[in-house]
UniProtKB/Swiss-Prot annotation:
Its main location: cytoplasm. It comes from Mycolicibacterium gilvum (strain PYR-GCK). This is Transcriptional regulator MraZ. Belongs to the MraZ family. Residues 5-47, 77-120 form the SpoVT-AbrB domain. GO terms for cellular component: cytoplasm; nucleoid. It comes from the Bacteria. The keyword Transcription applies.
Length: 144
């Protein structure tokens, strides 16, 4: 599971060092794809394959939204293996989509990671901070 917030730097070659505590979970390969809010999602390869299988099953049952999502997901996904220093190289398209420059934020999202531009993350946090309590009540109801 992935929890926490980290602030790695993107180097001039587009490489990002993954937080050390996540490297073992991602050593078998990972999939980087566009996510919501102009961020990137990083999934362990095995879990990504399971997710694709579920979406593919829905797409084969004639769900046009699932087919469109699967098509876009496949086109925007890049397979990566961390190097010996725990770095991955983000494609120019992914860097452009997420507006990544030098300062980045990596957040744990329970079963995957998100990569954000540091300024975009700060703005997102400020925008949603006062709604956090109401959103948790609505989304989680009696669980909490």
């Amino acid at each position: 599971m992935f929890f926490g917030t980290y602030t790695p730097k993107l180097d001039d070659k587009g490489r990002l060092t993954l937080p050390a505590k996540f490297r073992d979970a991602l050593a078998g390969g990972l999939m980087v794809t566009k996510s919501q809010d102009h961020s990137l999602a990083v999934h362990p390869r095995a879990e990504f394959e399971e997710m694709i299988a579920e979406i593919s099953a829905k797409a084969k049952r004639g769900n046009p939204q699932a087919r469109a999502y699967l098509r876009n997901l496949a086109a925007s996904t890049d397979e990566q293996y961390p190097d010996a220093q725990g770095r991955i190289t983000l494609s120019p398209e992914h860097r452009r989509y997420a507006n990544l420059t030098k300062d980045c934020v990596v957040t744990g999202s329970i079963d995957f990671l998100e990569i954000w531009d540091a300024q975009a993350w700060q703005e997102y946090q400020e925008l949603h901070e006062e709604n956090f309590s109401a959103a948790s009540d609505e989304a989680l109801g009696d669980i909490l």
